[in-house]
C-alpha cells in the first residue's frame, strides 16, 4: 500500500497534501499527559520503549495523520556522547557546558549508540502497529542546534554562547560539530534499520546565523549527514528544517541534497515556490498560534498555506511544534479543512 507522505518525498504531488504535526505527541493530548505522569521524567519517557511507542501512536489513533514521528529528543546524542543531560521541570534541558576549548577537548568523538537502544526498540514497536499507509519518521537535531545547547548548557534566547565560541575558537567549535555529524549519521542509520521510512534533521536555531556562518555551521554539517546516510542507504528520504533560514532556503536545499525542506510561517511564499519547491518538496507552514486561535482565523491561515504550496509537492504541517494549550477541536478543524482540499 502506498504511503502518501513518502510519495511526496519521492517526487509525486498528491491532490490532498499528506499531513502531520511537529510535536504531535505532546501535552495538548490528555492521553499523553496520562502516560507522561506514569513515566516520571521526560527522559524516562524517551527511554521507555513501551511508553515512547504508545505516545508516538496516540495522535495517529486520534487523528489519522499520514506520518508518525518517533517520540524522542534532539539531546539524546549528547547523552550518547557521554555528556550529562537533564531536564529540569519548568526550565528545560540542562547540560554540563562545553564553553571553552579546554572543556571541548574532553568530548568523546564517538557516540555509544547502545545508550539509545530504547529509541530503536520504540521504532520497531511503532512500525509493527502503524497502519500500512502511515509513514514513520526518525529524526535528529542538526549539529549547529545541538551544539548551542552543549556549549551553553541550556537553551538561550539568542544562542549567543555558541555563536561567540564559534567566532572566538572555530577550531574547537568544529570538534563539537564533527562529533555530532559522525554520531548523527550512525544514529539515523540505526533508525532506518529499526523501521523509519524517512528522516528529519531539525535545525531549530539556524535562523540566528549570518549567511557566512549559516553556510559553515548549518549547511555544511547537514550536507555531511545527508551524504553519510546516503552512502549506506542511497534511497534514504531526508527532510531538512532550517528554521528561520528565510532567503537562505534556496541555497540550503541546493547544497545539502535534502528531499524536502520544512519551512516556518515567516517564509515568503513566492520565493519558496519559485526557488525551493521547484527543486524539492515543501513541508509546512501553519503558524502554531493560528492553530490555537481556531475559528475563521484558522480557516484563513490553512487556506493561505494550501493556496501557496498545495499546487506543488507539499506536506501540510506547522511552522514549528504544536503548543500545549492548543485545543484538540482546532486540530480537528485544521484536519477537516486540509482533507476537504480539492487540488
From Swiss-Prot:
Its principal location?
A: cytoplasm
Binding-site list for substrate: 23-27, 73, 149, 204, 320
Quote the Pfam families the UniProt record gives.
URO-D
The UniProt site entry described as Transition state stabilizer is assigned to: 73
Any Gene Ontology CC annotation: cytosol
Q: Where in the cell is it found?
A: Cytoplasm
Q: Name one GO molecular function term.
A: uroporphyrinogen decarboxylase activity
Query: Which CDD domains does this one have?
Result: URO-D
Q: Which UniProt keywords apply?
A: Cytoplasm, Decarboxylase, Lyase, Porphyrin biosynthesis
| Source species, domain of life | Bacteria
UniProt-listed PROSITE patterns: UROD_1, UROD_2
Which reaction equation describes what this protein catalyses? uroporphyrinogen III + 4 H(+) = coproporphyrinogen III + 4 CO2
| Entry EC no(s) | 4.1.1.37
Any S-S bridges, and between which cysteines?
none
Which pathway does this polypeptide act in? Porphyrin-containing compound metabolism; protoporphyrin-IX biosynthesis; coproporphyrinogen-III from 5-aminolevulinate: step 4/4
Among Gene3D superfamilies, the record links this protein to: 3.20.20.210
Function statement? Catalyzes the decarboxylation of four acetate groups of uroporphyrinogen-III to yield coproporphyrinogen-III.
Q: Which family does it belong to?
A: Belongs to the uroporphyrinogen decarboxylase family.
The UniProt subunit note reads as follows: Homodimer.
Give the protein's recorded name: Uroporphyrinogen decarboxylase
Amino acid at each position: 500500500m502506498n504511503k502518501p507522505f513518502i510519495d511526496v518525498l519521492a517526487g509525486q504531488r498528491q491532490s490532498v497534501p499528506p499531513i502531520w504535526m511537529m510535536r504531535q505527541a505532546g501535552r495538548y493530548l490528555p492521553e499523553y499527559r496520562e502516560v507522561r505522569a506514569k513515566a516520571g521524567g521526560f527522559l524516562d519517557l524517551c527511554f521507555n520503549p513501551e511508553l515512547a511507542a504508545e505516545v508516538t501512536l496516540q495522535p495517529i489513533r486520534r487523528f489519522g495523520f499520514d506520518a508518525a514521528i518517533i517520540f524522542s529528543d534532539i539531546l539524546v546524542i549528547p547523552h550518547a556522547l557521554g555528556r550529562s543531560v537533564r531536564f529540569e521541570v519548568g526550565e528545560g534541558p540542562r547540560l554540563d557546558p562545553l564553553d571553552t576549548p579546554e572543556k571541548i577537548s574532553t568530548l568523546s568523538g564517538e557516540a555509544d549508540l547502545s545508550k539509545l537502544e530504547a529509541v530503536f526498540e520504540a521504532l520497531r514497536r511503532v512500525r509493527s502497529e502503524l497502519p500500512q499507509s502511515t509513514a514513520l519518521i526518525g529524526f535528529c537535531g542538526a549539529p549547529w542546534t545541538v551544539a548551542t545547547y552543549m556549549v551553553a548548557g541550556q537553551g538561550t534566547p539568542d544562542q549567543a554562547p555558541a555563536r561567540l565560541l564559534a567566532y572566538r575558537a572555530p577550531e574547537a567549535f568544529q570538534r563539537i560539530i564533527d562529533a555530532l555529524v559522525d554520531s548523527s549519521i550512525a544514529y539515523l542509520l540505526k533508525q532506518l534499520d529499526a523501521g523509519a521510512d524517512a528522516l528529519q534533521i531539525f535545525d531549530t536555531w539556524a535562523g540566528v546565523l549570518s549567511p557566512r556562518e549559516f553556510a559553515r555551521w548549518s549547511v555544511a554539517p547537514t550536507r555531511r549527514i545527508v551524504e553519510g546516510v546516503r552512502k549506506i542507504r542511497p534511497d534514504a528520504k531526508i527532510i531538512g528544517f532550517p528554521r528561520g533560514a528565510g532567503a537562505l532556503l534556496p541555497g540550503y536545499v541546493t547544497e545539502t541534497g535534502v528531499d524536502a525542506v520544512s519551512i516556518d510561517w515567516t517564509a515568503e511564499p513566492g520565493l519558496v515556490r519559485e526557488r525551493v519547491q521547484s527543486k524539492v518538496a515543501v513541508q509546512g507552514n501553519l503558524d502554531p498560534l493560528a492553530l490555537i486561535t481556531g475559528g475563521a482565523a484558522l480557516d484563513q491561515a490553512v487556506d493561505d498555506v494550501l493556496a501557496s504550496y498545495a499546487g506543488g509537492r507539499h506536506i501540510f504541517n506547522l511552522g514549528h511544534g504544536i503548543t500545549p494549550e492548543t485545543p484538540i477541536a482546532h486540530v480537528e478543524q485544521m484536519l477537516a479543512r486540509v482533507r476537504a482540499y480539492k487540488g
